[in-house]
């Protein structure tokens, strides 16, 4: 016999979490639990405002429709809504015990704020020093100076940078001008520096700073292929779709000689632990981009190892659908 439950969560965010144009005060999403006999599987459906094509309400309607079929014994195709496809595929994989349990809890720390504080955090990193710095929120020249200072001060540091398509070509060049050419090879990649793919490609070839595709991966005309100056693709499953789709993208990236990075869309601790398992399975040699839990004030259902944040249990969540 099959049963399914859909829970809704809302977790307060730390002050100052800004997406593209708005402050994110709470992270809201759905957790799905599939039960079949003694086995169960969980998944998270949490569209990210400003980044997902679907709203949470739209995702809930689609999830309820899929679950209604599933409980009745009908196997439906993956939802066309990426967050729904991802969450439901995780729940099914757990139920069928096909999502490996081993997880990669390494995370490239997400660095924001004062360079002196960053320096202390980065210096204390154990093992491979890989960190992520958001650029494009302030002046491009300032970003270039900070990146240069960090790379100069920490010779074993590699940086991943993310500009979210925020720069014109001129601003991107302004950033590059302040990064010593001798240090640029330690920028693993800069995600989508410019507003268009063509400008980003030209920037990479002109500056020697490698780029990665992020937003582009979710666009209909995107193809994974080897290109001069392109080092990686960033895969955000909540925005991309099912586990099968993520697996396909990783395989295509590796065949093209590109790095594939599994990355968070600010999921709850439950979703993050599943992303850590996905990363250990599909991209075992690459540090995933999962350092977003500290943006929240609580964990949900499953804890992240060693996190001091309080845990919201199933009993504390609202049930929005059950059959």
From Swiss-Prot:
Catalytic reaction(s) noted: (1R,6R)-6-hydroxy-2-succinyl-cyclohexa-2,4-diene-1-carboxylate = 2-succinylbenzoate + H2O
UniProt KW Nucleotidyltransferase keyword: no
Highest taxon of source: Bacteria
GO molecular function: hydro-lyase activity; magnesium ion binding; O-succinylbenzoate synthase activity
Chain positions recorded as Mg(2+) binding sites: 162, 191, 214
Known EC number: 4.2.1.113
Alphabetical list of CDD domains matching this protein: OSBS
The keyword Lyase belongs to this UniProt entry's keyword annotation: yes
Enzyme class at the top of the EC tree: lyase
Cofactor: a divalent metal cation
Swiss-Prot/TrEMBL keywords: Lyase, Magnesium, Menaquinone biosynthesis, Metal-binding
SMART domains, A to Z: MR_MLE
InterPro entries per UniProt: Enolase-like_C_sf (IPR036849), Enolase-like_N (IPR029017), Enolase_C-like (IPR029065), Mandelate_racemase_C (IPR013342), OSB_synthase_MenC1 (IPR010196), OSBS_N (IPR041338)
Active site: 134, 236
BP GO terms, sorted: menaquinone biosynthetic process
Pathway: Quinol/quinone metabolism; 1,4-dihydroxy-2-naphthoate biosynthesis; 1,4-dihydroxy-2-naphthoate from chorismate: step 4/7; Quinol/quinone metabolism; menaquinone biosynthesis
Family to which this protein belongs: Belongs to the mandelate racemase/muconate lactonizing enzyme family. MenC type 1 subfamily.
Function, as annotated: Converts 2-succinyl-6-hydroxy-2,4-cyclohexadiene-1-carboxylate (SHCHC) to 2-succinylbenzoate (OSB).
Record's protein name: o-succinylbenzoate synthase
Organism of origin: Yersinia pestis
Gene that encodes it: menC
């Amino acid at each position: 016999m099959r049963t399914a439950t859909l829970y809704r969560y809302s977790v307060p965010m730390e002050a100052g979490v800004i997406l593209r144009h708005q402050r994110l005060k709470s992270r809201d999403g759905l957790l799905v639990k599939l039960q079949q006999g003694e086995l169960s599987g969980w998944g998270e459906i949490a569209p990210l405002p400003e980044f997902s094509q679907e709203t949470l309400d739209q995702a809930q309607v689609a999830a309820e429709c899929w679950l209604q079929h599933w409980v009745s014994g009908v196997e439906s195709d993956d939802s066309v809504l990426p967050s729904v496809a991802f969450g439901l595929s995780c729940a099914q994989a757990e139920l069928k015990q096909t999502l490996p349990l081993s997880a990669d809890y390494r995370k490239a720390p997400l660095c924001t704020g004062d360079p002196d504080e960053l320096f202390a955090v980065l210096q204390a990193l154990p093992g491979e020093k890989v960190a992520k710095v958001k650029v494009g929120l302030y002046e491009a020249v300032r970003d270039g100076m900070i990146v240069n200072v960090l790379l100069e001060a920490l010779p074993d540091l590699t940086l991943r940078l993310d500009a979210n398509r925020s720069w014109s070509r001129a601003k991107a060049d302004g950033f590059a001008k302040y990064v010593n050419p001798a240090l640029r090879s330690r920028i693993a990649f800069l995600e989508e520096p410019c507003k268009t793919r063509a400008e980003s490609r030209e920037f990479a070839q002109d500056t020697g700073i490698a780029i990665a595709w992020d937003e582009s991966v979710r666009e209909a005309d995107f193809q994974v292929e080897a290109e001069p100056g392109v080092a990686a693709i960033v895969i955000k499953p909540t925005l991309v779709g099912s586990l099968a789709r993520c697996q396909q993208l990783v395989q295509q990236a590796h065949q093209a000689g590109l790095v594939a990075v599994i990355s968070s869309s600010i999921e709850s601790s439950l979703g993050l632990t599943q992303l850590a398992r996905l990363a250990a399975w599909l991209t075992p040699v690459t540090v995933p981009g999962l350092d977003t839990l500290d943006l929240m004030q609580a964990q949900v259902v499953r804890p992240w190892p060693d996190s001091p944040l309080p845990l919201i249990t199933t009993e504390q969540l609202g049930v929005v659908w059950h059959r």
